[in-house]
């Protein structure tokens, strides 16, 4: 296929949608495409220079006539400006709201054909989709796009059920950069964090929102720590962090739980971990599961949303019901005490990563969509 000029608009902050949008752009740039990020700030994963990657900042001014800064209008104007000046072939919007709507407005301003691809990541459907004042706008955003993808079949199904669009929604899974997420030498990393060689390490990585149920993770770890020597790594930050700290103090686990905040090299922490817990009550995919699996960490997740598409129960990990701390504890101890089971899960997970979630496969799927939409030279 010919090399394309692709505009990407996304949330630049820490979070699955921003990570995938940025990593996709980086991989596309490596394949020779010209990538233009159009965002409010530099995406946090855009940490290396590449001659094919360009950043265009959306600067929002405050005016007395507007009660709130007009980000959406400014973004639409910026997309149109960049698309016109750089002669973009494609605009890829990550999130239906506001990005797909802004891409549509930009297309109307351009008055020329430009392909709009919208990727649904979760919150734009599973949270905003339940707001009656936004549902029709989300449907409009989806149906105004030329192609629409969702990061899991579960999310696509929920979108059809809740929003009821007529547009076809294709499932294209998330992916990770296999060159980054791989198991590393662990002795020095463990020593750096004061973890003894014979201690088991449990890890949880999230944005510490209520839906992540971090308190369940702590309760499961409390049970684990009562049975074996272990440490819990809590990686990330968010509104539930203070509540998590209170629970840790209540259970007297201060010496066994490391609150590490946001980390740039989370792959180092996965490399020293024996078990990954993701016990969310709502999860459209669970990108952190792929990251952990690639680093050789067996995973336990809840049987909701897109997680069962990532973890095959009793094949590449365990699934438990939301809130079932007892079952999660039992499954965790099975993995921590049975090295053969742990190794079996790890091997199966890596095979599934290579077959279903490889960056080569996923990026090629997006490339095919772009090629279908791009005007011939």
Swiss-Prot record:
InterPro entries assigned: Glyco_trans_1, Glyco_trans_4-like_N, Glycosyltransferase_grp1, Thiol_BshA
A Gene Ontology BP annotation from the UniProt entry: bacillithiol biosynthetic process
Annotated binding of (S)-malate, by residue: 17, 95, 123
Protein residues bound to UDP: 207, 263, 291
Molecular function as annotated in GO: glycosyltransferase activity; nucleotide binding
UniProt-listed Pfam families: Glyco_transf_4 (PF13439), Glycos_transf_1 (PF00534)
Phenotype caused by lack of the gene: Mutant does not produce bacillithiol.
Enzyme Commission (EC) number: 2.4.1.-
Signal peptide, first to last residue: none
UniProtKB keywords: Glycosyltransferase, Nucleotide-binding, Transferase
Catalytic activity: (S)-malate + UDP-N-acetyl-alpha-D-glucosamine = (S)-malyl N-acetyl-alpha-D-glucosaminide + UDP + H(+)
Subunit structure: Homotetramer.
Protein family per UniProt: Belongs to the glycosyltransferase group 1 family. Glycosyltransferase 4 subfamily.
Cited function: Involved in bacillithiol (BSH) biosynthesis. Catalyzes the first step of the pathway, the formation of N-acetylglucosaminylmalate (GlcNAc-Mal) from UDP-N-acetylglucosamine (UDP-GlcNAc) and L-malate.
Protein name: N-acetyl-alpha-D-glucosaminyl L-malate synthase
Organism (species): Bacillus subtilis (strain 168)
Gene: bshA
